Amino acid sequence: MTTEVILHYRPCESDPTQLPKIAEKAIQDFPTRPLSRFIPWFPYDGSKLPLRPKRSPPVISEEAAEDVKQYLTISEHDAKSHSYDCTVDLLEFQPSLKKQHLTWSHTLKEQTNSGNLGKQSEKGKQHKRRSWSISLPSNNCTKNVSPLSKKLQDSLKALNLHSLYRARWTIEHTICNSQTLEDIWTKLNQIIRHNELPSCNATIQRHLGQIWVFCDIMYCEYVGSLLKGRLALTGKINLFVHKYGVIFSM
């Protein structure tokens, strides 16, 4: 009896001495070993159960069994004779109820629901106040940008910071010059919409009483001067960089 073997191999495995050995191993029978006889871990002779309950099962008398049967028979009869009416307690199916009263109650309910929806929408409008503002890329506002001051350049050199790092100007509510933080935020949004602040995006932190204006460090002095002038800020604003803290003030 001959066996035909088709062997597929990779080009890197084209050694003529190894291919016959691989083919021989492929057609060899798998080694088998006899299974050992199963021996249970508990003593078992076939006539007794290995595990027994500690207590005997409860015994039900014939009288108790008859009582249970009678109870089940009565409950089944009641279930079959009961007619389920889905219109019970529904106002529309009560013949003594006038149609006008139903219409009035339905209208009152609609008015109540519409009032609740109006209140919810007003609350939603209050909470959906604008919190972020992002400027679009523009080359016009970068023409007036001057080189960084020597003081800021020295700080960047000492901290090994690149001029394209993002920094943050912090506007506190205490320097708004008799203006509210919302007034400053409205003016800032108008400035950003007109692309007067290069590479800037801003957010208002109402719970902190602050406005954060993010920009590249290479434009930070230009952005800071424009913020102080256009927003009429009276105090000092700080330039914050992540992991480095305040690196410059104006």
From Swiss-Prot:
Major location category of this protein: nucleus
Cited InterPro entries: Shieldin_RINN1 (IPR039996)
Cellular compartment(s): Chromosome
GO cellular component, as recorded: chromatin; chromosome; nucleolus; nucleoplasm; site of double-strand break
Biased composition, class Polar residues, residue ranges: 108-119
Domain of life of the native organism: Eukaryota
Annotated keywords: Chromosome, DNA damage, DNA repair
Miscellaneous: In BRCA1-deficient cells, function of the shieldin complex is necessary for sensitivity to the PARP inhibitor olaparib.
Function description: Component of the shieldin complex, which plays an important role in repair of DNA double-stranded breaks (DSBs). During G1 and S phase of the cell cycle, the complex functions downstream of TP53BP1 to promote non-homologous end joining (NHEJ) and suppress DNA end resection. Mediates various NHEJ-dependent processes including immunoglobulin class-switch recombination, and fusion of unprotected telomeres.
Subunit description: Component of the shieldin complex, consisting of SHLD1, SHLD2, SHLD3 and MAD2L2/REV7. Within the complex, SHLD2 forms a scaffold which interacts with a SHLD3-MAD2L2 subcomplex via its N-terminus, and with SHLD1 via its C-terminus. Interacts with ASTE1.
Name this polypeptide is given: Shieldin complex subunit 3
Organism encoding this protein: Homo sapiens
Gene name for this UniProt entry: SHLD3
